[in-house]
């Protein structure tokens, strides 16, 4: 039997479950979560910190409830180094350091996929190409960056 794929979820995937502003994305995310037992799912302490910053207490409580059932990755010492490289290479703007940390966490914990709905910074060709270059140069495991819908 093949091992389950290891998936890292950024905060946008968790928040999409409860975001009524985009019904299609919400529905696709719900469909993905209905299949979640097929995968090993992870978030990180960065995800938890972003959820804690959520100003809406009801929305925040729902997200905390959802991540409470997901394995949390601890931060490894080399994540900051890779996050810096992601920013210096232009994959992610310095203003969005959290996004670089999500990617670096997924890479350094050898995830198969990073799932995100963040098309502005993460799920885009430029970021994917630069991340592929960084992982190749540093002899790190390649990671696929996709939306939850792409794994349905």
Predicted regions: what they are:
Residues 1-43, 50-64, 70, 88-94, ...:
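Short, well-structured N-terminal submotif of metal-dependent ribonuclease cores
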Residues 6, 40, 114, 143-144:
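A residue-level structural signature of the nucleotidyltransferase/glycosyltransferase Rossmann-like core
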Residues 42, 73, 144-146:
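General small-molecule cofactor/ligand-binding pocket signal
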Residues 45, 76, 149:
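Residues at the C-termini of beta-strands that transition into short coil/loop
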Residues 72-128, 152:
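Active-site neighborhoods of divalent-metal-dependent phosphate/nucleic-acid chemistry enzymes
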Residues 136:
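Catalytic and substrate-binding regions of cell-wall glycan-acting enzymes that process beta-1,4-linked
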Residues 139-152:
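Short, C-terminally biased terminal segments at protein or domain edges
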